[in-house]
Amino acid sequence: MKSVAVVVFAVFLALVPPALAQVPDSATFGRKNTFGIFVDYSNDSSHIILGSAEGRKFTEIGFQYERRLIVTHNLVWKYTAEFRPLIAESDLTYIETTVQTSPPPAQTFVSQPVAIPQCRPASASYSFINPDTGIVQAGTITISCGRRWTYAEGLSPLGTRINFLPRKRWQPTGSILAGFLLSSKKIPVDTGGSFNFMFQVGAGVEYFRTPTQSMRLEYLLQHFSNAYTAPTNYGVDSGLFKFTYTFGR
């Protein structure tokens, strides 16, 4: 345990500049133009805002640009835009397996996976007499749930961010972003669309290692849906954890 504590303390010293006193208290952290790279992840989805598709996973890697618009003693207001070249979205799939035991010989039929809003595993037996042949038909039907991943890209050109306490290294921050994503398959269901609108709102904390470099950790509520540009519009609500590294000039 002692060695682990030493390693953690060493990493902390590497991340936090030792010469904190070199930055005057009156200085404002950050620059007019800021660039960043981020990664985020959500392990599940549920009905939070408008979405009804459950069990979706979502992760992305992207790039961020921010331009400072207003600076006061208490806050900084910025324009924000993000480009996401790599998005992976995972949907639940439904698979039906029918094992017919009568009449012999036994036969098995497996359906193709179908992406649906929710999936619950189930199994049931059936038995009936075919009125045309008088033969007993019996067997079992099993519903199993799977998962498929879909590649997508996204762009959020409409966004804003507010940082509070701009003269402090630790700054509370909040953001709103709006844009769209394009996917290689229809999401989140097979009757959905490959084009979806996306909205994010969240808050977190930003730590400035130097006046021009920072690390930001946020929790975001995200919604995407096709606004009925496709036959169905289930939508997905997710809670994402997002880490961003930024540098300014």
What kind of region is each of these model predictions?
Residues 37-39, 61-67, 156-162, 176-180, ...:
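Residues on the lipid-exposed face of transmembrane beta-strands in outer-membrane beta-barrel proteins
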Residues 38-44, 82-86, 177-181, 220-222, ...:
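Outer-membrane beta-barrel pore domains and translocons
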Residues 48-56, 88-152, 183-194, 230-234:
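Extracellular/periplasm-exposed beta-strand and loop segments of Gram-negative cell-envelope proteins
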Residues 23-31, 204-249:
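Predominantly the C-terminal beta-signal and adjacent terminal strand-loop region
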Residues 31-37, 75-83, 172-178, 197-199, ...:
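Transmembrane beta-strands of outer-membrane beta-barrel proteins
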Residues 21-32, 69-79, 165-172, 209-214, ...:
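Short loop/turn motifs that connect adjacent beta-strands in outer-membrane beta-barrel proteins
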Residues 20-69, 236-249:
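Short glycine/proline- and aromatic-enriched beta-strand/turn motifs that initiate or cap beta-hairpins
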